[in-house]
């Protein structure tokens, strides 16, 4: 009998639910290294065994926040297990999301190029 595969839509739904639940759970974590953290996105492997969790932080050092989140990953996994109604709750792997920083840098470079072009004209 062929193995039943989950639909890509279900993968997205579960990733979104994990993102919402983690956002709530992080407010309850008492580690001072975790300041104002925003979960930007969650990417799941097809077998739901692993989840890449991308975050940004408004306060504090991103590296310290990453260490604190990695330290809290086991607790967060257990809390997700209580909330989610799926057979396998993924192992959480946190990654600092540099997308916003890159966008700001690109915007700065564009502004700089436009200013140089205006000076030349």
UniProtKB/Swiss-Prot annotation:
Gene field: rbfA
Functional summary from the UniProt entry: One of several proteins that assist in the late maturation steps of the functional core of the 30S ribosomal subunit. Associates with free 30S ribosomal subunits (but not with 30S subunits that are part of 70S ribosomes or polysomes). Required for efficient processing of 16S rRNA. May interact with the 5'-terminal helix region of 16S rRNA.
Keywords, alphabetical: Cytoplasm, Ribosome biogenesis
InterPro entries in UniProt: KH_dom-like_a/b (IPR015946), RbfA (IPR000238), RbfA_dom_sf (IPR023799)
Localisation per UniProt entry: Cytoplasm
Family (UniProt): Belongs to the RbfA family.
Pfam families: RBFA
GO biological process, one term: maturation of SSU-rRNA
GO cellular component, one term: cytosol
Protein name, UniProt field: Ribosome-binding factor A
Quaternary structure annotation from Swiss-Prot or TrEMBL: Monomer. Binds 30S ribosomal subunits, but not 50S ribosomal subunits or 70S ribosomes.
SUPFAM superfamilies: Ribosome-binding factor A, RbfA (SSF89919)
Keyword Cytoplasm appears in the UniProt entry: yes
GO molecular function: ribosomal small subunit binding
């Amino acid at each position: 009998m062929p193995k039943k595969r989950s639909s890509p839509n279900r993968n997205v739904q579960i990733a979104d639910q994990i993102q919402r639940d983690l956002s709530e759970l992080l407010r309850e974590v008492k580690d001072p290294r975790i300041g104002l953290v925003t979960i930007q996105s969650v990417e799941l492997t097809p077998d739901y065994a692993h989840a890449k969790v991308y975050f940004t932080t408004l306060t504090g050092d991103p590296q310290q926040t990453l260490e604190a989140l990695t330290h809290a990953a086991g607790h967060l996994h257990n809390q997700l297990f209580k909330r989610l109604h799926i057979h396998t709750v993924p192992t959480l792997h946190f990654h600092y999301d540099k997308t916003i920083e890159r966008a700001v840098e690109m915007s700065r470079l564009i502004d700089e190029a436009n200013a140089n072009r205006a000076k030349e004209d």
